[in-house]
Amino acid sequence: MIDLPRHPPSMLPVIRTVPEHAATGELKRRYDAVKSAFDVPWMGVVAMAHTQYPRFFDALWEGFEPIAGTRAFQDACRAMRAATEAGVERSLGISPLAHRLQDLGYDPREIGEIRTIIEVFSHGNYPYILLATVSRYLLSGGDLSGEPQVFETSPRSPHIFHQPILMEPHHADEHTRGIFADIQATLALPILNTDYRALARWPSYFHLAWAELRPLIRTPSHAALSQQLHEQAIAVLRTLPNPARLKGDMVTRGCGR
């Protein structure tokens, strides 16, 4: 059985990607295919990085896209989300911010918009986690064990999500750029994830939320939750159906550009 230890993000190489607005032709087709399969309005950086190696990505996606359409995959994403959110509520003790935002002058519509953006990423991050986990597992010599014949596709009602408006570093004031830098340093991230750029659209909320979260990073409870999610993703990939018979040698043959 292949061992996949959890590595901190700082061990990642430099990630080079093409932003969605600049993607054209075959690259845009790949981006659109991922967003459609995952029912999300944004292309995650982890998937963008995969598409920088087109032959590899196409081989992986040919087998992974049918998996993403199964009920088992979608149920697994929901279960991972539920376990993570329950763990956060149980062990991190994060304080609600709604009343503090109201004191700053936020009305219910504005708070609702923030909650919608949070829902976009809370819904959409888990398919990307599973894509990254399956990709790493296959490249490490593993093979998916799920049966190709036994699976149930899941017709779903697409979420009506609009593409998030992002606060890029060159849009932000000095204070927000400082928070961006602090997030990357504190979380040891080689890139600034889309989630943070989307939530920074409301700077006063963003400052409050990061001030609340930052002291919890790297605490034993935070580390345990991170490890729990990592282990849950590995457990899921070993039970997923495999309708297109995705195998490790299929993706390793595509590792050249």
Swiss-Prot record:
Catalyzes the hydrolytic dehalogenation of small (R)-2-haloalkanoic acids to yield the corresponding (S)-2-hydroxyalkanoic acids. GO terms for molecular function: (R)-2-haloacid dehalogenase activity. It catalyses: an (R)-2-haloacid + H2O = a (2S)-2-hydroxycarboxylate + a halide anion + H(+). It comes from the Bacteria. Belongs to the HAD-like hydrolase superfamily. S-2-haloalkanoic acid dehalogenase family. Keywords: Hydrolase. It is an enzyme of class 3 (hydrolase). The lineage of its organism: Bacteria, Pseudomonadati, Pseudomonadota, Alphaproteobacteria, Hyphomicrobiales. Its EC number is 3.8.1.9. It comes from Rhizobium sp. (strain NHG3). This is (R)-2-haloacid dehalogenase.
